[in-house]
UniProtKB/Swiss-Prot annotation:
Protein's recorded name: Cytochrome c oxidase subunit 1
Species for this entry: Vanderwaltozyma polyspora (strain ATCC 22028 / DSM 70294 / BCRC 21397 / CBS 2163 / NBRC 10782 / NRRL Y-8283 / UCD 57-17)
Covalent link location (1'-histidyl-3'-tyrosine (His-Tyr)): 241-245
Subunit structure of this chain's protein: Component of the cytochrome c oxidase (complex IV, CIV), a multisubunit enzyme composed of a catalytic core of 3 subunits and several supernumerary subunits. The complex exists as a monomer or a dimer and forms supercomplexes (SCs) in the inner mitochondrial membrane with ubiquinol-cytochrome c oxidoreductase (cytochrome b-c1 complex, complex III, CIII).
4Fe-4S keyword on record: no
Binding site for Cu cation: 241, 290-291
EC number(s) on file: 7.1.1.9
Binding sites annotated in the UniProt record for O2: 245
Gene name of the encoded protein: COX1
Compartments reported by the entry: Mitochondrion inner membrane
Cofactor: binding details: Binds 2 heme A groups non-covalently per subunit.
Cellular component annotations (GO), alphabetically ordered: mitochondrial inner membrane; respiratory chain complex IV
Length: 534
């Protein structure tokens, strides 16, 4: 056991480790968000006894856990590591031992992050860690330093993973698989890896300078010494904006596969989808200052960032309409992954609308640091990235584990989380339009109504998460029985494809990519000889 899991160089085992880790961190992050919602359920001090520093520490912890320890390990480390080699017909990742250290850098990073909240009074900076609040004057203890170390370790982990994905994709494709024939999920991970490679060094530089300011008496961000805190914002957001695309582009890849399978159609405009993802990735590097409209940028700078940000809506729209065109006229089967995919399309588009509103510098001056922004990025992440993780799990886990989940429970879990997240985040738009500021644990009584509704929603979402954990256990314990039951319910009455070839019909899920042609679960070494794809 120790040999297999601790020293593993097998992409599948490492992917499973990533997945277990991300579920654990996701539960911790959800716990933090529940405490935040409990505190905000009513005006005045509710649960934290007036400890506003603790509130901000929880906000920081929630954000960093969800972004760096849930979404990225699950989508890139979990699904990416498991499926990318299978989809391109590779025996493993290009650098298996590098893959191992990529994972094992994350638990120490988690230890640093948790420690940072426990020493002194925690890092109450928000996940952006803006100077001067994160400076040595305002946060005198080791908390922020520990948070910076956590960011450093997750950065190195992701960077090594990105190098691995790029080399694997370029060098280890099977015979006949040109770049044009790669599945969309492989393209998504490939583009994500480039985003990581180009943006993470900038974050590392920015927080390293902050570390120097805090401990070695430099003044990169100290105005008294000739520095400028706005430099930190530029460095952080030059990473921070590509980061949100790092989280959503793998989700795009997952959704493409699911929409295609459950509509029984190839994705509409497959090459356009690749170009759209690449355009989103490129444009993501040219828009970072739209997070900084209120720091005193020039008028023409603001005009540029407004226009450039709106241009990102074009390739995103291409993707949305291509998915809709894939569904249109298809033979649709509303299995659980497809329900998540359709919910993704609807809610991600809503999040995109609010994003276009926030792109306007003139409007953003009013919306900046209000709950409108919180509502916007939670629609995109909590109902974009997270829904695609659930979709991908329900889509691929029966094949990865060889064990089926309980279909009915999964549908209940979908409806619970669908209702829950909307009840949480829809009212936040109204609060934001009325000017309720972010990251403040107390608020005027006028905001009480919608905040109460939002907190009710968080309980619904929490129940769905608990149900998901039960579904996981049920899948591991009763997976084979579920397989028999599910077949009679869905696959026999409404198979994905019906062919005259019986060998083909026995394969329950039919896709255009090769990972489902393997055994279920796949062998430890899936391809000893290259799979020929044409």
């Amino acid at each position: 056991m120790l040999q297999r899991w601790l020293y593993s160089t097998n992409a599948k085992d490492i992917a499973v480790l990533y997945f277990i880790f991300s579920v654990f961190c996701g539960m911790a992050g959800t716990g933090m968000s529940m405490i935040i919602r409990l505190e905000l359920a009513g005006p005045g001090n509710q649960y934290l006894g007036g400890n506003h520093q603790l509130f901000n520490t929880l906000v920081t912890g929630h954000a960093i856990l969800m972004v760096f320890f849930l979404v990225m390990p699950a989508l890139i480390g979990g699904f990416g590591n498991y499926l990318l080699p299978l989809m391109i017909g590779a025996s493993d990742m290009s650098y298996p031992r590098l893959n191992n250290i990529s994972f094992w850098l994350l638990p120490p990073a988690l230890v640093c992050l948790v420690t940072s909240t426990l020493v002194e009074s925690g890092a109450g900076t928000g996940w952006t860690v803006y100077a001067p609040l994160s400076g040595i004057q305002s946060h005198s203890g080791p908390s922020v330093d520990l948070a910076i170390f956590a960011l450093h370790m997750t950065s190195i982990s992701s960077l090594l993973g990105a190098i691995n994905f790029i080399v694997t994709t370029l060098n280890m494709r099977t015979n006949g698989m040109s770049m044009h024939k790669m599945p969309l999920f492989v393209w998504a991970i490939f583009i994500t890896a480039f985003l990581l490679l180009l943006s993470l060094p900038v974050l590392s530089a920015g927080v390293t300078l902050l570390l120097m300011d805090r401990n070695f008496n430099t003044s990169f961000y100290e105005v008294a010494g000739g520095g400028d805190p706005v430099l930190y914002q530029h460095l952080f957001w030059f990473f921070g904006h590509p980061e949100v695309y790092i989280m959503i582009v793998p989700a795009f890849g997952v959704i493409s596969h699911i929409v295609s399978t459950y509509s029984k159609k190839p994705v509409f405009g497959e090459i356009s989808m690749v170009y759209a993802m690449a355009s989103i990735g490129l444009l993501g590097f040219l828009v970072w200052s739209h997070h900084m409209y209120v720091v005193g940028l020039d008028c023409d700078t603001r005009a540029y960032f407004t226009s450039a940000t709106m241009i990102i809506a074009i390739p995103t729209g291409i993707k949305i309409f291509s998915w809709l065109a894939t569904i249109y006229g298809g033979s649709i089967r509303l299995a659980v992954p497809m329900m998540y995919a359709i919910a993704f399309l609807f809610l991600f588009t809503l999040g995109g609308f609010t994003g276009v509103a926030l792109a306007n510098a003139s409007l953003d001056v009013a919306f900046h640091d209000t709950y409108y922004v919180v509502a916007h990025f939670h629609y995109v992440l909590s109902m974009g990235a997270v829904f695609s993780m659930f979709a991908g799990y329900y889509y691929w886990s029966p094949h990865i584990l060889g064990l089926n989940y309980n279909e009915k429970l999964a549908q209940i879990q979908f409806w619970l989380i669908f209702v829950g997240v909307n009840v949480i985040f829809l009212p936040m738009h109204f609060l934001g339009i009325n000017g309720m500021p972010r990251r403040i644990p107390d608020y005027p009584d006028a905001f009480a109504g919608w905040n109460y509704v939002s907190s009710i929603g968080s309980f619904i979402a929490m129940i769905s998460l608990i149900l998901f954990i039960y579904i996981l256990f049920d899948q591991l314990y009763n997976g084979l029985e579920n397989k028999i039951n599910n077949k009679s319910v869905t696959f026999m009455k409404a198979p994905d494809f019906v062919e005259s070839n019986n060998k083909f019909n026995l394969n329950t899920i039919k896709t255009s990519s090769i990972e489902f042609l393997l055994n279920s679960p796949p062998a430890v070494h899936s391809f000893n000889t290259p799979a020929v794809t044409n």
